[in-house]
């Protein structure tokens, strides 16, 4: 007989944030067993989740960041969806071998397409030939998304990422988890709640900031709602997070440094600048506080290392040993605790590519947290958005250029693995069985399986 378990992945939750403004979470932690542990490296969503769900370190599951440079295609690829990208046996596959009746629902965790989990749902826009982007989700079974949308409405994509990101996306995901539980009663439910990821990057992890406290209260209320829901259905809940957010005030522009050295190749496209990775001698794929540096000209290896080691804001330059060789950079760079890496490569904002001022997570050669902000220099941002939406409704192609190019706006980041305990991810379990404190992200998989198996 297996226990039914729901794992709530509350992104950004740490010991340092639990307290006055999170009474439901605080009570759950007080009544259970909590482990703070060294995060995955890099401490980003795709790497952390892959370690949790395979029990393997990065060099074995292969997820070196949220995106990386594909050397064969000579393209940077971020936020891909196929579960086949993650190497290794997943925990639901292991548990199914123990008991063929075991089932798993994977709700908005990443790499959620073509997974062997029983029920999955993930954000997946449609891209018609007209060039439009139509917000939608993907599910397995395929018909499930329409059934869920008929009850919850369309997924609020703009609250999942961008300047309007907020609690709405996490509420919809929680609603989909309830729907799947009522309809299917999975043995294991994996539920992704990203809300804190937004405000903590916008404002920093500052508990003296009333805006942060308000957002903590929102996620606490939602977690409390799920705790009550699952308790009524005799489902054990585990609380989990992926990383903590560190306060930052120093953006570091590695690709601009490389460009000044003459190592970056720029392609002119309609008067704007595009980074040509395949033709560049050296370039960086930035992901929060970690960057993979790819060196196409091996003769520059030592010169690149010396430049990086003497760059303000850089804490470490690591060798790629221990990382997935075909995906990782030739060097892996870690920022100082107060710094983070941009993808910026242009030296004149007037020549920035057209997607730079848009929410465009796939074209940018790195992660861009500035997408969480509206450009403060826009006099009438709501009017710009209204014009865009009108054009979109009429079937015209248009760019929603409302994102600033000011990296100093970002106040929180993550990615480092050497962080204080109060900024480490946590795992909270309930029940009478007392476990050893976990110390590594790979151990999360065993702990989840132990709870399902009642061990």
Where are each of the predicted segments found?
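Acidic, His- and aromatic-enriched active-site or binding-groove loops in soluble protein domains
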Residues: 122-150, 211-221, 256-275
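His/Asp/Glu-rich, glycine-adjacent segments
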Residues: 56-206, 280-285, 289-296, 300-316, ...
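Residue-level preference for the first positions of well-ordered beta-strands
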Residues: 4-6, 186-190, 236, 330
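Histidine-centered active-site microenvironments of extracellular/periplasmic hydrolases
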Residues: 243-289, 341-424
